[in-house]
């Protein structure tokens, strides 16, 4: 595909009315034997609220290009404009091959970072490390330009290459980056 535009969207964690998360938490409390990881988190010292927060963030947002070896996306051209990302852990976006222009976007993961730090201070880094903190990622020779964006709360705001993925090209202009309220 080419000339794909995703604009004026909000990408938010959980459900707005929290019905899904309340149902999930109630099911775990009522049937703890069916949820060993939940029990493990409690045994490690996490509170129900911390577990709720642990599950709250959106893990992955945009992936463009399905794998490092499938080059079918090499001609993709995408524009992400005027979008709002709240408490996403990764892929705002992640691009393999192709070209992306990201502008006038707000990527705010500070609340999620605060949750991660709270969990780390309570039960250690083994659990908090599962809350990743990545922003935009360019891989496999992709080209990405970010302009006039606001990025907050991400340890790795801009990434070229990710894991075993080859590097791509990524550049940001007029983009503000804050971590814990500091530029």
Where are the model-predicted features located?
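Glycine- and acidic/polar-rich repeat regions and solenoidal domains
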Residues: 1-182
